[in-house]
Amino acid sequence: MLETRALGYHPATAPRPLLEGLDLRLPVGEPVLVAGRSGSGKTTLLELLAGLAEPDAGQILWRGELCSAQQRRWLCGLVFQFPERHFLGLTVAQELRLGHRRLEAERIEAVLEQVGLAGLPAQQAPERLSGGQQRRLALAVQLLRDPQVLLLDEPTAGLDWAVRDEVLQLLLDLAKERALLVVTHEPELFQGRVAQAWRLRGGQLEPLPTMQPGLRP
């Protein structure tokens, strides 16, 4: 389980902390949702958990032990809201192999099938993919690292309804074997699909009373 205790973050240019006294638990197998308006600190929370930034206060723990930023970078896989801005490979194949000295073709094919991209042309440019395909490709890149925690920034934003349902089901399947946190401004899409649902407001987490806990069968 990934856990925060009294987590705080105060940007130097902000009049007040963006996150303050934040306690959050991400158990394996129980997807968690954090909703909030733009600028509420959702993405900052993901960056702290992923080891891309350091909190000003509090602790981040994995299985009860303090977890450094470097450890969190190995532990967590972060998929950004706009993955196309973070693609570095000129082709799908290059993007998938970045950072891997050795990666068997069978492993790549298995992950692409897992995210619904079986048969995707390896020489296709990532920026030529549809929005839904780009999200899936970014997810495949992270899954190849075999992270213990998946952190997803607005995974359904801008997708049509049919693709949204497919992505939602994929996320639930992935959450069975790892900790998973989704941040979104569309919490209603996850109704009945998550174990915990929170709203980030004023730097703190509040329960979302309209969200029913528990996964869909």
Per-region residue spans from a language model:
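Helix-to-loop junction immediately C-terminal to a conserved catalytic motif
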Residues: 50
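Conserved ABC ATPase "signature" region
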Residues: 105-121
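Conserved ABC ATPase signature
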Residues: 125-129, 133
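ABC-family nucleotide-binding domains
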Residues: 160
